[in-house]
Amino acid sequence: MAKLTKRMKAIKAGVDSTKQYEINEAITVLKQFTSTKFVESVDVAVNLGIDARKSDQNVRGATVLPHGTGRSVRVAVFTQGANVDSAKAAGADLVGMEDLAEQIKKGEMNFDVVIASPDAMRVVGQLGQILGPRGLMPNPKVGTVTPNVAEAVKNAKSGQIRYRNDKNGIIHTTIGKANFSAEQLKENLQALLAALTKAKPATAKGIFIRKVSVSTTQGAGVAVDQSSL
C-alpha cells in the first residue's frame, strides 16, 4: 500500500468526508491545502441522475465560465475563405486546411482546442484517429463545428469548458485556479450547474444533480451543500 505523504495526511485529517460543506467553507478548506510549488486547478465532479448506459441520457456540451479557467488556451482552426481572417482576428493561434492537417499528421499538435467550419470537415474527418482519442475532434454539440468560427475562438479563449459524463454518469471538469477568489469560483460553479440543468435529458427521471464535489489538482474532494449555491 502506498505511503501517504505528509500533505495528504493533513488533507485527510482536515476534510470531513461525511460532511457537505457550504460553498465558501468548501473553498476555504481547499485553499488551506493547496501546493506552494504551483497554482493548482480547482476541479469539480458532478454526479448526475442519469443512466449512462442509455445514449439518450448522456450529457455533453460546453459553456463559458464568467471568470474563465485561468488557463492560456491555444486554438487551431480549420477553415477557408473569409473565415480565415475572422479566425485570426478573434485570436486563433493556427489557421489552415490541408497544411494544418499535415502538421497534425506529423505529430505537431501545439494546441488545446480544435475548431472547424462545416466546409472544412472533409479535411478534419481524416484526422479522427489522431484527434478523437485526445478529445480534440470538433463536434457541433459543443460548438466546435460552426460557421461562426470567430465566435467559437473567442469562447475558447475566454474560458469555455467542455463537459461530458463518464460511464458512471459523472461530469469532471475545471472551474478555475486555486488563486481565484471564493466568489469567482462560486460563480463559475453556478454557471456550470446552470448549463448542466439546462442540458438535462428529457428521459432522465428523479433528482438530476445528485452530488457536487470540488477538489484541487492534488487534493481530496470536498462535498458541497447545493443549497449554498
Swiss-Prot record:
Q: Name one GO biological process term.
A: translation
- Which Gene Ontology molecular-function terms are recorded? rRNA binding; structural constituent of ribosome; tRNA binding
> Which Pfam families does the UniProt record give?
Ribosomal_L1
Q: Which UniProt keywords apply?
A: Repressor, Ribonucleoprotein, Ribosomal protein, RNA-binding, rRNA-binding, Translation regulation, tRNA-binding
Example GO CC term: the record gives: cytosolic large ribosomal subunit
Kindly state the subunit structure of this protein.
Answer: Part of the 50S ribosomal subunit.
Family to which this protein belongs: Belongs to the universal ribosomal protein uL1 family.
> Which NCBIfam families does UniProt cross-reference here?
rplA_bact
Q: What does this protein do?
A: Binds directly to 23S rRNA. The L1 stalk is quite mobile in the ribosome, and is involved in E site tRNA release.
User: What is the designated name of this protein?
Assistant: Large ribosomal subunit protein uL1
Its ancestry begins with:
Bacteria, Pseudomonadati, Pseudomonadota, Gammaproteobacteria, Pasteurellales
